[in-house]
Structure formats: C-alpha cells, structure tokens
Amino acid sequence: MKKPTNYPTTMKQLKTATDIVSLCVIGLLTGQASALSLTLIDGSVGAVAAGNTLTAAVQAPASGINVDGSSIIYQGTAIQGQTQAATYTGFSLAPSSGSTPTLNLGDGIFLTSGSANIPPTNTTNSFSNALLQPGSGSNLLLTTLSGFNTNDANALSFDFTVDPGVTSVSANFIFGTDEFPTQSVTDIFGFFVDGVNYAKFSGGELISNTPNNPTNFISNPVGSGLYSIEYNGLTKAFNVVGILDSGLTTHTLTIGVADTSDSIWDSGVFIGGLKAGTATGGGGIGTTPDGGTTLILLGGALAGIAGLRRRLA
C-alpha cells in the first residue's frame, strides 16, 4: 500500500530527518547475557522527528497499516538531554536462575514515564528521572483510564487506514516498573484503538502495578541479578489485540504510558510488531511465545535523535 509522501519510508530519509548517531557498547554479566540495544531519542529533536521515527519502528514489516503521516502526534519531553523514549532491538532477557521465563520480544519502541536510559542491572528500588518541569504534561486518555491525574506522559498517536476485510490491529509488549511491588501510586500503560483501551490483563485489570494484580508481574528484586534490567517488576511478553470500529474508514491508535498522581519512580513499555489482522470479538491481551508471535488470545470478553545505541547486559 502506498504511504503519504510526507511519511518517511527509508532509512536514508529517517537518518536525514533525525540525525541518528549511534555508539555500540557491549557488556556481559557472569552467567547471563542480554542483547537489548537501545537508540535513545533526545528531547531536542522535536516532536515531528521523534514521532516519525517511533511510528516507523513500532510497525511490523508489511504491517498492512497505512499511516497518515500528517496525523502523527508524539508527546514527550522537549528538553535537550532528556531521553524519555527510544527504539530497541534484540530484546531477550534470560533469568540468571530459577524457573522464571526468558523474556523475548521483537524489535520496536520503548516509551517511559521518565527515562529510557535505564541501567543494565536493577540497582535501586526507586529508579526515577523526574522530568524538568513542566515535563511532558498529562494525557487525557490515560487520565480518564486511570481515574487519576497523569504526569510525564509519553505517548504516540496516529491515524491510519487498512484494506477491506481487516478488523483489528495487534502488537507485542512487555511492561516494566519500579513501582512494583510496594507503591499504591502507580504508572499506567494504554493501547487505545479508536478511543477504546485494550491493554488489560485477562482478569480485566489495567496494565499498571496495583494491589489487585501482583500475580501479573514477574519480580526482579534489587541485587538478585535475575534479569539484566532496572525494573523491579516485569510482565510476561503479551500480544494485545484492538478491534477496529467498523463504522469508521480512518482509524486512530494511541500508545502511551504516564505517571499517575506523582512524577517519580519510572515505568516503561517495550512494544512492537504492530500489524493489521482479522480478529473479532472483544479484543484484549494474551501471552506470546519466543520471538513475540501470538500464541493465544485471552480476554475475548474484555470490552536531533541524539542517540546512544547500547546493549544492556
């Protein structure tokens, strides 16, 4: 399908638009390795360049989604030196011990409520990058979803069309947070298709650390070295499916995370593989096998880049 001419479709165009600068650093921990590579997006590149880069990176090859380039909206910090979002490759986190799963995810984007420049090990229970005020502000969809004021929102939104017969869109994600397991004021993730959020656990809980869903997270305690990543809590790799509004010819997708009520203790979502599909019913999330391919759909009844590319290990 032909994309609008103002939408960057080649790496040459993307590099020209965003001035990508990469520095690869590889590290290994004894008995454990990670190939997660982040290309950080500096706030100074501007919302247009950041939005174009993230929109291209979140989609699967031959996604079947025709993005209206003029509709792309990126919400994130605009301050030089602040890196709230990133693109990523090679997400594969193997546990150092025990029976917890290896977490694998296809390439995509990383949105956070603070900093995407996360440490390669879990060193603190309160990793936080309080964005220089006024930060990135609130997000109406996430505020309405959570029922609380939101701050430090990091969101990507765009309009798109699909071929006849397409009824859904889907993506694969892992949500991580340093709010787990102790905080009652928590961050939130939303995946909104035509205004409806489909990012819910199978029991209907929102994707956030709340007292009602501790079993939905894998614990990664400080000092345990279980996973080579900062966050205290991680979800499994999930596939989220959103059902398109059949009454619309142009659809809207919004992906976002935010702090609720405060501006501290970071969370983030790794998400990619966005593509069109033919699912019907209520949508929702389900687990994915290695590599981020859909295994089973659960919850059917649930209604410039001034980048540092590095490897976390």
Region locations from a protein language model:
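Bacterial N-terminal signal peptides
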Residues: 19-29
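Sec/Tat signal peptide C-region and signal peptidase I cleavage site
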Residues: 31-35
